[in-house]
Amino acid sequence: RCFMLENKKIKTALVSVFHKDGLDEILKLLHAEGVNFISTGGTQSFIESLGIPCGSVENLTGYPSILGGRVKTLHPKVFGGILNRRENEVDQQQITQYEIPSIDLVIVDLYPFEETVASGADESAIIEKIDIGGISLIRAAAKNYKDVVIVASKAQYAPLLAMLKEKGASSSLEDRRWFAKEAFAVSSGYDSAIFNYFDGDEASAFRYAGNHAKTLRYGENPHQKGVFYGNFEEMFDQLHGKEISYNNLLDIDAAVSLISEFDDTTFAILKHNNACG
């Protein structure tokens, strides 16, 4: 493969995020590399507060944010900039004809849908936290990973920063494909959460998408591997002992089920899922 085709310079970045913490170092580094920024609303104000020039999506598209912010980035001048194939002659003719700037980096994070559900908010507030523009930007940029870097959550800020420090404002095909994979993990998990909310008590199906959270000491037997998906550290504090194994998790589950039957403070010792003391 041609080296120059695989390594891409980042010239223009679209940034539209809900959570802005941890972003300033990335923005300053990109600015120092001569990258141009396009953004919306609060994110644009945040970028400009760092002393970095930033163009608005509204100026690019010729349309303001409408419908109470429900429609901001959904426009051919935005998505054409992301989806155009740099080596496709017809694509390049069309973006020239319609004056569409190519976008090489997209940084997005999504409205906090799961957190809003967990807060006990009413349905109207929950519905407003179903992201439309952000999820569309993620899918578009990830689809065109051969030309575009997509950063789909603040969990990927650290890998992006490491890449920029190593390579400057450029990326390899391997980098872009990795970020695309992570982006589809974000989008699939987000849609799974929305489905589970609407499915509710019907339980017609269960969709789960999670990150590889915890490697267990071993599986059911020592020669087997085990992995736990979920937020174990948020649910439990391990006070003593070795790393958790699969069988330990089964005992923990049995213990929680047992003590949930009691209103008073309860203590139990379990072995192989059975209370023994």
Please place each PLM-identified region on the residue numbering.
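A short, charged helix-loop
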Residues: L105-E128, I132-E174, G230-F236
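Glycine-rich nucleotide/cofactor/substrate-binding loop typically near the N-terminus or early
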Residues: G42-F113, A205
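General beta-strand structural signal in soluble alpha/beta enzymes
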Residues: V15, N36-G41, G55-N59, N84, ...
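Short coil/turn connectors at secondary-structure junctions
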Residues: K8-T12, A32-V35, L50-P53, H75-F79, ...
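N-terminal glycine-/serine-/threonine-rich phosphate-binding loop
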Residues: M4-L60
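Gly-rich Lys/Arg/Thr-decorated short loops/hinges at beta-loop-alpha junctions or inter-strand turns
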Residues: L5-K11, K72-F79, F113-D122, A141-A142, ...
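Active-site loops and adjacent core secondary-structure elements that bind or stabilize anionic groups
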Residues: A155-M163, G168-G277
